[in-house]
Design a protein with these regions (language model features):
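Alpha-helical recognition/docking segments in bacterial nutrient-uptake
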Residues: 37-144, 212
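Bacterial carbohydrate/catabolite-sensing allosteric modules
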Residues: 21-22, 63-68, 92, 116-120, ...
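Secondary-structure boundary/capping motif
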Residues: 8, 53-54, 83, 165-166, ...
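Generic recognition of short, well-ordered alpha-helical segments
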Residues: 29, 55-57, 86, 168-169, ...
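Short, glycine/serine-rich, charged loops/turns that create anion-binding
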Residues: 2-5, 49-50, 79, 106, ...
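N-terminal helix-turn-helix DNA-binding module of bacterial transcription factors
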Residues: 1-38
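Short gly/ser/thr-rich secondary-structure transition/capping motifs
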Residues: 22-28, 82, 100-103, 233
Length: 259
């Protein structure tokens, strides 16, 4: 009945179905796993959930259940490589069929050593499969927009990204485009922190520095992601009560917060 219902007559199928309803039968997923060796679990590791990009990506991944029926086990690895390795060992104990990694903690070579399918999203992925956006083109378009809008100084705000990480191309494209068009620019890679508040404090210091260093100039600010851009926007409104024409902001990621 469960594996080959077509081998039964419709009458017998109906009888069995009624009996199961009477008995209050519920499907036993564990029995199915033991029978076919497939857990239908996929592990997901994100670095945090306070950056809107990661929370939105997680939302999109989880919403795929209705189409593909895979279940997800999710860990947030905010405290280093040792913790992330423990999470992966825990996931492996559930016989996950694959792993989706958005964190940057473990090398792709280490991830490949676990001998399961691994998909990286926007991170170093020399030894595993990966999905990335065209970071260079996105940065080029953002920088070109600020140049076309005749900003006096262009400023890029980011973390100190390693060159092996795809997002480094945002920094590279910004600098190369500014040099090509011979426009003044400033790159600030001092953003860091392990919480939303810590990052906001850094963005606030950067905002204060920019205010002091570039008064009365039209400042074109290209921020590494939409969360940073939203923080910066709020700081502008907190100071001025409106959005002055001495600022133009561009984020990256198309997170819902940018709407």
């Amino acid at each position: 009945y469960f594996n080959h219902p077509d081998s039964l007559t419709l009458e017998n199928q109906e009888k069995i179905s009624q009996a199961l309803d009477t008995l209050g039968y519920k499907k036993n997923k564990l029995a199915k796993v033991l029978a076919n060796g497939k857990s239908e679990f996929i592990g997901i590791i994100v670095p945090n959930l306070y950056l809107h990009y990661y929370s939105e990506m997680l939302t999109q991944l989880l919403s795929s259940y209705s189409n593909y029926h895979y279940k997800f086990l999710v860990f947030s690895s905010e405290h280093g490589a040792e913790e992330e390795q423990q999470y992966i060992e825990e996931l492996l104990s559930y016989q996950i069929e694959g792993l989706i990694v958005l964190s940057h903690t473990l090398s792709s070579q280490k991830l490949a050593s676990y001998q399961i399918p691994v998909i990286a999203i926007e991170r170093e992925a020399e030894y595993i499969s990966s999905i990335t956006t065209d970071n260079y083109m996105g940065s080029l378009q953002a920088t070109s927009l600020l140049i076309r809008d005749k900003c006096d100084i262009l400023i890029h705000i980011n973390v100190n990204v390693e060159k092996t990480v795809p997002a480094y191309d945002r920094i590279r494209a910004f600098e190369e485009t500014c040099k090509e068009y011979q426009v003044p620019y400033d790159i600030d890679l001092s953003v860091s922190g392990n919480s939303y508040q810590e990052i906001l404090n850094v963005i606030r210091r950067i905002f204060t520095r920019i205010e002091e260093k570039y008064p009365n100039q039209k400042k074109g600010i290209f921020l590494a992601n939409d969360t940073y851009a939203n923080m910066f926007l709020n700081l502008i409104f907190q100071k001025y009560g409106y959005f002055p024409d001495t600022y133009e902001l561009v984020g990256f990621d198309n997170s819902p917060i940018a709407s």
